[in-house]
Amino acid sequence: MAGHSKWANIKHKKAAADAKKGKVWTRLIKEIQVAARMGGGDIDSNPRLRLAVDKAYDANMPKDNINRAIQRGVGGVDGANYEEIRYEGYGIGGAAIIVDTMTDNRTRTVAEVRHAFSKFGGNMGTDGSVSFMFDHVGQFLFAPGTPEDKLMDAALEAGADDVVTNEDGSIEVICPPNDFSKVKAALETAGFKAELAEVTMKPQTEVEFAGDDAVKMQKLLDALENLDDVQEVYTNAAIADE
């Protein structure tokens, strides 16, 4: 089935992540620590930790850094005791935004998130005010030109729920979040390497932005992304590639 154009947005996201590699590593270390603290330090019995470690390797994080983060999480090394807090809100035009944070000071974090929303024309909502507009899924994006039929066969055999061909020729594979690591391994064994692979909150519908509104919306998203305590920002805003 056809879908919205994704490729330019994904390339922009990857470039931004590469430009902020130090911040990406900091976020991943937090995620590894929390995953290890909650589910133990064995990646074979802790799917969340396996996902976090895989993401760390994809970001070229050294193995020593990963192991230290795991040890902090399970209590072998002193480290900050982070808690996970989700904030929900709206951007201009009523676009839905979810902000996932890990923090050792929730008073600081909520103040910073609220300030970013208000500074750039948005406002914070209550718990559950927008999360119902998203689905929690595993998502893989493959470059235009990827053999569609072979990818579809491999994906469905691996346990994927859906395969979507976008208008720009890129292909999305969607799977249950708990099956993400299994599907990722099966696709790579079949010879398919995704340009983007993540467990995410996927919007059920999108709100299109262009021109000045797109610029304003991007400023809000960037302000939230740049906060130290923010791990992920999800939105149903589809910003045109200018």
From Swiss-Prot:
Q: Name one GO biological process term.
A: regulation of DNA-templated transcription
Q: What GO molecular function annotations does the UniProt record carry, in alphabetical order?
A: DNA binding
Question: Do the record's keywords include Nucleotide-binding?
Answer: no
Which family does the record assign?
Answer: Belongs to the TACO1 family.
Q: What is its main location?
A: cytoplasm
Q: Which Gene3D superfamilies match?
A: 1.10.10.200, 3.30.70.980
Q: Which NCBIfam families match?
A: PRK00110.1, PRK12378.1, YebC/PmpR family DNA-binding transcriptional regulator
Top-rank taxon of the source lineage equals Bacteria
- Cellular component per GO? cytosol
The UniProt keywords, alphabetically, are: Cytoplasm, DNA-binding, Transcription, Transcription regulation
Question: Which subcellular locations apply to this protein?
Answer: Cytoplasm
A UniProt-annotated Pfam family: Transcrip_reg
- Protein known as: Probable transcriptional regulatory protein Bphy_2064
